[in-house]
């Protein structure tokens, strides 16, 4: 497995392989999806709480929306770590004043571009979910409406 000391964070750099660039684009798509999710959630809460005369909660939802809009809200991020065989996409949450690794979102084979759901922190589940070398798969995955930050799109249907 990739230990904390041995792993190397992937720098988002276009000089790396195409597959690395695709992983970076997937991370961007997941971050957009999470931002869109949070906006929808706070807009719904604002409307609901306002109709219930819960100004404390509707004010909170409105404040959260303002923070997202002006870029000060510490939204979830997705980082890419490079291992021997896989790129590991890891969810990063903002806690105690800094972003920290939370859970593994996906594994991507560095050679083939095959995308796997995680079986645990250090290994992928069996069964390829998507292939980043396939243009139609990329077109699907790079649209934030098609992926979800919680990983539901990685389940076999």
For each feature predicted by the language model, list its residue ranges.
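Short, non-transmembrane alpha-helical segments in secretory-pathway proteins
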Residues: 12-68
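Single conserved hydrophobic/aromatic residue that forms the stacking wall/gate
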Residues: 1-11
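Cysteine/selenocysteine-centered motifs that mediate thiol-based redox chemistry or coordinate metal-sulfur cofactors
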Residues: 146-157
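A short, surface-exposed interaction/processing loop segment used at functional sites
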Residues: 112-144
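A short, surface-exposed beta-strand/turn
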Residues: 102-116
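Exposed beta-strand-loop-beta-strand "reactive/processing" segments of non-cytosolic proteins
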Residues: 66-106
């Amino acid at each position: 497995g990739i230990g904390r000391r041995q792993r190397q964070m992937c720098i988002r750099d276009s000089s790396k392989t195409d597959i690395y660039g695709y992983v970076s684009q997937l991370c961007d798509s997941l971050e957009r999806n999470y931002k869109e999710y949070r906006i929808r959630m706070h807009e719904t809460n604002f409307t609901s709480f306002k109709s219930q005369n819960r100004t404390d909660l509707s004010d909170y939802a409105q404040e959260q929306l303002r923070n997202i809009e002006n870029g000060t809200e510490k939204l979830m991020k997705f980082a890419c770590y490079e291992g021997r065989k896989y790129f590991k996409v890891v969810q990063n949450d903002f806690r105690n004043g800094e972003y920290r690794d939370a859970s593994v979102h996906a594994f991507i084979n560095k050679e083939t571009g095959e995308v796997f759901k995680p079986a645990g922190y250090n290994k992928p589940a069996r069964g390829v979910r998507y292939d980043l070398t396939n243009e139609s798969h990329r077109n699907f995955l790079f649209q934030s409406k098609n992926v979800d930050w919680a990983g539901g799109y990685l389940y076999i249907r």
